[in-house]
Amino acid sequence: MENSRFLSCKYRSSFGSSNARRIRAKCEIPAVVYGQGNDVLHLKIKSSEFNKKFAKFTDNTVLILDDGKVERCVFVKDVAENIASKLIYHIDFYEVDKRVELEKYIPIKLVGASIGVKEGGILTVLKEQVKVRSLPLDLPEFIELDLTPVNKGDSVLLKDLVLPSNVKLAESDDNLEVVIIK
């Protein structure tokens, strides 16, 4: 498993604004984990470790919080930050069961220069994301759509998207158009 997914964490028992300031003064970030029907867990994470990885996160990035005993599969739900000072005040994580498939919208990343566009066609994007189903750790950050072979007058349907082998389309109609070149 990718090392970039792992974040070390420690449990914390002190709460409130003054305690959060003390945690941040020690170059750590207060955080909470909720979901899975469990009580809310209060954690702290090293700022340097989180900041190093944070720029690479998307809404679909699944992280593994590791306290040395238990690994928790989570998504970043919310990050409270001061944009001017680039200081992160607090993180909310949402825990999911890594053994249970889930449905999530994944962005479609367009790559390549279409033959149809080179011939003067106009590219119209009708769908920017696609609903897929997979285990959390198998979720892709994006679905790549190569436009290179698409000619003028052609369209690409949802069912034409190339998905990783462990990811399934979860849209109700796989005949919907993703892009059209007119």
Curated annotation (Swiss-Prot):
> Cell division: present as a keyword of the record?
no
Which key words are in the record? Ribonucleoprotein, Ribosomal protein, RNA-binding, rRNA-binding
The answer to keyword RNA-binding applying to this record is yes
Q: Which SUPFAM superfamilies match?
A: Ribosomal protein L25-like (SSF50715)
**Biological process annotations from GO:** translation
Per UniProt, what is one GO molecular function of this protein? 5S rRNA binding
Among Pfam families, the record links this protein to: Ribosomal_L25p (PF01386), Ribosomal_TL5_C (PF14693)
Role this protein plays: This is one of the proteins that binds to the 5S RNA in the ribosome where it forms part of the central protuberance.
Summarize subunit and interaction data from the UniProt record for this chain. Answer: Part of the 50S ribosomal subunit; part of the 5S rRNA/L5/L18/L25 subcomplex. Contacts the 5S rRNA. Binds to the 5S rRNA independently of L5 and L18.
Q: Which PANTHER family match?
A: RIBOSOMAL PROTEIN L25/GLN-TRNA SYNTHETASE, ANTI-CODON-BINDING DOMAIN-CONTAINING PROTEIN (PTHR33284), RIBOSOMAL PROTEIN L25_GLN-TRNA SYNTHETASE, ANTI-CODON-BINDING DOMAIN-CONTAINING PROTEIN (PTHR33284:SF1)
Of which family is this protein a member?
Belongs to the bacterial ribosomal protein bL25 family. CTC subfamily.
Q: What is this protein called?
A: Large ribosomal subunit protein bL25
